[in-house]
Amino acid sequence: MSDEQKTKLIELKQKVNDLEFELDKIKNEFMMKIIIAVILIFFLTIVGLFYLIINLSRIISLNQKRKSLELKTKELNHEINKIEISLL
């Protein structure tokens, strides 16, 4: 049982690492789109507004995906903690 739990723990930690990497990519893309929109709105109001309107659905979907990944990561970390406690 202990070896099985250790194997599951290693798999979960790898999953969390993969999710955190994906989450970082999404956060970077999300922030880049927001920054570009703010800069364009500040300097070129019309172009910035069109950019924001065109990319609004992508920005919203990135934000939803980010929230989903954060929740999944939190759940996996909770499961990892439970396994680690049971191994003590």
Swiss-Prot record:
Where does this one sit in the cell? Membrane
**Topological type in the membrane:** Single-pass membrane protein
Q: So where does this one cross the membrane?
A: 34-54
GO CC aspect terms: membrane
Q: Which UniProt keywords apply?
A: Membrane, Transmembrane, Transmembrane helix
Q: What is this protein called?
A: Uncharacterized protein UU064
Species assigned in the record: Ureaplasma parvum serovar 3 (strain ATCC 700970)
